[in-house]
Regions:
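Noncatalytic, typically N-terminal accessory segments of nucleic acid-processing enzymes
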Residues: 1-159
Length: 159
């Protein structure tokens, strides 16, 4: 019987979400399809799995949040083949956003990409609130300043 509830409402209930995941895993297992089930937040597992797969083939990751994009940019390395991130959300009257992770890393440089998790947590992510009045664009421009870079290095070395 089809579920007539909106996806967001259904998945907002943790019991429903876990039951759906369990059923999906059972079905995938029936067809010998490999899967990974994240215990906590799935973003890091998705990014690490994409990097592992990208060592032998091109990878397309479809996701809905900036956390995943930041983790991909941070973790993809030179040994990886092409990694593409496609947003599954389309803004009204706008095109779907698609990022080539290697080109994005090339544009921003390794130093900035290494510090992106620091910048992202400072400006708001799934697990932290953003500081009032500091957007991601402004913070990214300021990341070239030595003081902010030093704070970012300290943050990244202690996590």
């Amino acid at each position: 019987m089809p579920c007539k509830t909106k996806k967001e409402l259904f998945m907002s209930n943790s019991h429903n979400k876990q039951a759906f995941i369990n059923i999906l895993c059972e079905k995938l297992n029936e067809y010998d399809i490999r899967y990974k089930n994240a215990v906590d937040d799935a973003d890091l597992l998705i990014a690490q799995t994409a990097v592992d797969c990208a060592l032998s083939s091109e990878v397309i990751v479809i996701g809905e949040d900036t956390d995943l994009l930041v983790l991909l940019i941070h973790h993809v390395n030179q040994q990886c083949r092409w990694v593409i991130f496609k947003s599954d959300k389309m803004a009204i009257n706008k095109k779907m956003k698609i990022w080539n992770i290697q080109q994005t890393k090339g544009f921003h440089g390794e130093d900035i990409c290494h510090l992106l998790p620091f910048l992202h947590s400072l400006t708001g992510c799934d697990s932290t609130s953003r500081l009032f009045g500091i957007g991601k664009g402004i913070a990214l421009k300021r990341l070239n300043q030595e003081y902010l870079k030093a704070q970012g290095q300290l943050f990244m070395n202690t996590t």
